[in-house]
Amino acid sequence: MRFSANISWLFPEVPDFPGRIKAASQSGFRAVEVAWPYATDRTLFKAALNTHRMSLVLLNTPPGNIEAGELGLAAVPGRQDEFRTGLNEAVSWASDLGCDRIHIMAGRVPLGLERQFIEKEMEETFIENLQYAADILGQAGMVGLLEPINSLITEPRYFLNTPQHAASILHKVKRPNLKLQMDLYHWQIMGGNLTQNIKTYFPLIGHVQIAQIPHRNEPDSPGELNFMYLFDLLQDLGYQGYVGCEYKPQGDTVKGLGWMEKYLKNCDGDEDKTK
């Protein structure tokens, strides 16, 4: 199993992304992922990756106007041009930094509107934008990822909130370089049944993220999920991608990484599986 440090969440004690890349390297990671790197000087970000021999394995499309309540634009009607501009920016960053996976953020139901009245239009917009994105990403040799985000705790207005909905969209778009981003935190909240859902949707999964339920902390913190079992299940199914550590450290990030050290020590073989 290979783990990547989500530097938008881990190492909050370090003030900037280049510093967090260094901290992740010193903590045993060989890869990082990030939500939105766009406010950081790209030259400094790239230099940190190169200096510490780190891979960037995932970034997100720009969120739009966060202050106006936006969290992605791919499914928001009337914002197609802005989505495409943001996608081009994400592809530019990813190409320059050697990243081959981009999370295409669907976005929220627009303020003042009810889901039931706009859901059909949002799905049509999402499919249109995903078809466009798949072509652009395909030309760059990249994979686009769809992540369901739970609507019960985290994002009540987010358009895409269950693996079933995401899988349905993927089947309608029918593009091989579009995959499912499985965040086990969100999947557990939106129905659980993880063993069966992981097996059912495994052929679609292109990236995995983790956090414990209910407080979104380290995998070995008190909560609902047995991550040692889940890691073994993924490995048994043949998962070869990265597992992104997208959780809120309870305290010092490094002190909270004992779960990873324990798991890797228990793995068979001598290979460093963080690589």
Curated annotation (Swiss-Prot):
MF GO annotations: hydroxypyruvate isomerase activity
Keyword Mitochondrion annotated: no
Protein name: Putative hydroxypyruvate isomerase
Keyword DNA damage: no
Catalytic activity entry: 3-hydroxypyruvate = 2-hydroxy-3-oxopropanoate
Organism of origin: Xenopus laevis (African clawed frog)
GO biological process: glyoxylate metabolic process
Keywords of the record: Isomerase
Enzyme type, top EC level: isomerase
EC number annotated for this UniProt entry: 5.3.1.22
Positions annotated as active site in the UniProt record: 147, 246
Top-rank taxon, per record: Eukaryota
Record function comment: Catalyzes the reversible isomerization between hydroxypyruvate and 2-hydroxy-3-oxopropanoate (also termed tartronate semialdehyde).
Family listed: Belongs to the hyi family.
